[in-house]
């Protein structure tokens, strides 16, 4: 969950438009007979393997948000980065964010002629652990929290001495103290130089050596900018250009991503302005845009409601995606899209109630939602489909976590992502796929022709088991994530009698 969670926490009703609530899932697939399940007839899956509808551009991925449990030496940190490394995803997003200034901001005090406050001692361990865990894969870096001294404020903004203590009002100020943006661009130039150029020279001419020579393939410029520092499209575009200029001086090969909007459907003006090349300085690239979606139920709803609310809200978001993509194609057709925060936020998050975990099936339901979004966004040829987020825990959006903080294991949301990531890739052909029968809307299905064979992705959106009759089932095998797999990887499913049984909220990949 990126940085705007804070803002949503402070004004939840407004942000529901941009990040919606939480999913609850329970599901598993297993061998089924041809007998119909009680209350629902089996669905019939028909696939035309020779009829390609679209070629996928979509990479399944996720984000890592800096939180204290990810600090080096914490048990959850070691387990989490082990999971990241074993997953091996491309374009994982890394976001040190605003509640923890000491873990996110490298120069917390304004420089003077006598001294500067550059300090990476708390930032480096988590960042290096992330870069080591993603070695060999492109990443999306985003140090989105700027030093507040860059902005005009009535008085200096304070922050806790304890780096683990959250503060929700750090991002104060709307007007830069240097209206040209050069001071801000210089901060990011030095920050990036620390990691890619072995160090930097500070404002007083003092050299700071790191010895690091990492590559930053993609840099996302700030986060949820309509909230943090209350930027207008004009403000943000000017600041984007200044930051890109600064980072390009340190890392000429880096590509850039913009906006990371929390509430995209509320802000078409950002897309119209930012994607227009005439509004940028000459030579400033807009390689990617990004924006977010969270499903969010009301407090009175239960899991029996969530199974409808989440997918209904997802469909609303998909309409927003289509609208935004038309703007992109019109103004900047070479720009790619990263939907880098996709998930659910339950209304109990960050309250006393979030210490009571949701039903176990919730995480399967949330996994089913991600699978549904991956299918739909692949059809729309969205480039990056990013699940949010690796680590959450009570007081810090536990409903969005992909790790079980009680046992340090990946939860079903992680295993659904791994199943999809291992099965589907950009370049796969999506072919005509049809589910027939009463209740066909309860399951989403999409067949792909991949370099490793023919596959279909199935997502049960409902809290009851559903049978699906498969073509050529005798030649097929299946993997599934469901309630029976718990915090363990997808399991093999033996198919008999031509059917697969999708247990509540199951996500399955059938291969031929």
What are these regions (language model features)?
Residues 1-19:
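N-terminal secretory signal peptides that target proteins for export/translocation
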Residues 39-83, 87-90:
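Mature N-terminal, pre-catalytic/accessory segment of carbohydrate-active enzymes
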Residues 62, 130, 191, 219, ...:
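Conserved, mostly hydrophobic/aromatic
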Residues 87-310:
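Substrate-binding cleft and catalytic face of glycoside hydrolase catalytic domains
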Residues 296-351:
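Glycoside hydrolase catalytic-domain groove-lining segments
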Residues 339-424, 428-444:
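Aromatic/acidic polysaccharide-binding cleft in carbohydrate-active enzymes
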Residues 438-474, 481-483, 505, 509:
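Carbohydrate-binding surface patches
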Residues 491-512:
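C-terminal beta-strand-rich structural cap/linker in extracellular carbohydrate-active enzymes
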